[in-house]
Amino acid sequence: MRQARDWRRLAALGLCVVAVVVGFVLGEGYIDRLPQHAGYFLVAVDDEVRVPIPTRPRHTAFIVVDGLRRDSAETMHVAQELARAGQCRISDQGSFTVSRPEYALLSTGLEADRTGSRNNDLTAPLAAESIWQVARASGLHVAGSSHLRWFEQLFPAGFDRFAHEKDHRANVFAPEHGELLDVNVFHPLYVDEAGHQHGGASPAYAAAVARVDGEIAGLLARLDLSQDLVVLTADHGHRDAGGHGGAQPEIKNVLVCFAGRGVERRSDRAAFDGRSTAPALAVLLGLRFPRNMRAGDDGLDVLWEIAHATPENAAYLADRRAAVERFRTQNRITLEKWLGDQPGTWPRFYEREAGAQTRRIGATALFVLVCAVLSFRLRKVPARAALVTTAWVAFGMFVVWCVHHAVLGDFDFTVINLRERFLPRASAVALVAAVATVLAHLWIVGDRRRLAGDMVLVVGLLLAAMLGHVYVYGWPLGFPLPPQPARYFPFFGAIALVTYGLVACGLLLLERRRSP
């Protein structure tokens, strides 16, 4: 009898040790698991500008202020100047508000689900075509100036010249970075850094916004809006406490302004899909569309509200409208092949692929349920006691949610903000929740031996959830992207698995010392 009990205790201890190791491996590996720069379900459509644009802008300045909230952008003098000269809109940057994926979205016209750009770490070029590559292929010269190399890394064939300023005190808009070329991409980083370090509602953030306002004003002084084109936007905003990555309004909704040659003037703040940024540049510059841009269930009709229509460019705009319809038709035909029936729409395709993920979730849940039942039978836990344990596990999940919400916030990428802050706070959340759960068990059940067994059950459930995430969503993370909580879970889940695994190991060792 004792020998069998010792064997079960040793097996439980082994499971907990394995869980701790798996937690470390999956947690550290999740960042690398996110991206796949070959992309997913790319539809390539060949385009040709059959009617040339009558007059192309002399210089184009495309400005991405990293981490600029919409409310802060509205206070900038340069944004107000661009609004008077053209139009500003509220741009929806999607639900994956991480910087490198947003650079991909702005440049290609495609969402992160399909570009495959899902983290800031992977430096490999993106398969989806960018507007910068289109511009160079059309004979234009493209320059970049940034505190990061990420635009150039994503699209190495998209730039003739790229100035990388490692010193973030440097002005990326300054003339010493070279004369203005046909197309110029400017990307300052310090507003985002202020948001991470101090929060989007802090005086330091406001000071960074004031700095970029002044530096952009210096750039505008070198331009002539009767001849040149300026686009001002951001990749994402910041929450008040700092952080981005989720789909909160203050994070995903940013200001985008178009002003200069070829831009229609309007004073309202109409809606805009961030995926339409690259297509809008294509229309205003007289370029073909990026071949992989989103078409079908899109926001491309806004292009005809941004471009100023005149008798001189009527034929050109008609040609571009026809091109958009060709893109939509080709996407529809391709989707009908993939779906096997009509109508071929992106929402239907997303729904089908998400449905496959849901079925895998169901299979995982069934497997976990069977394992839990077998665990109860192996431990000879009566039905009533099993129900109490089930309620206790549910209570433990509720405790985790409450403590996480109180300390970190929403269950999404936004709470990560800075790694050096997130890791100790998330570890504290997991430890507090684990201790509270243990104390609740001691108070309700009052059986230390059963506590150790039930804690091992929790560790097994967490382990199954972490491995199940890989089974459900793939390695690398597949298509479509998981919902926000499931997208974030491997970060916190790994920390919880390690924490609960160590607590369970401690309980098992204590129980062994107490056993006769």
Placement of each model-derived feature along the sequence:
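Alpha-helical transmembrane segments of integral membrane proteins
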Residues: 354-516
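Phosphate/adenylate-binding glycine loop and adjacent helical scaffold
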Residues: 304-368, 392, 396-399, 465
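Anion-binding catalytic surfaces of enzymes that hydrolyze or transfer phosphate/sulfate esters
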Residues: 9-11, 21-23, 152, 159-213, ...
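Substrate-binding rim/cap in mid-to-C-terminal beta-strand-loop elements of soluble/periplasmic
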Residues: 100-110, 246-289
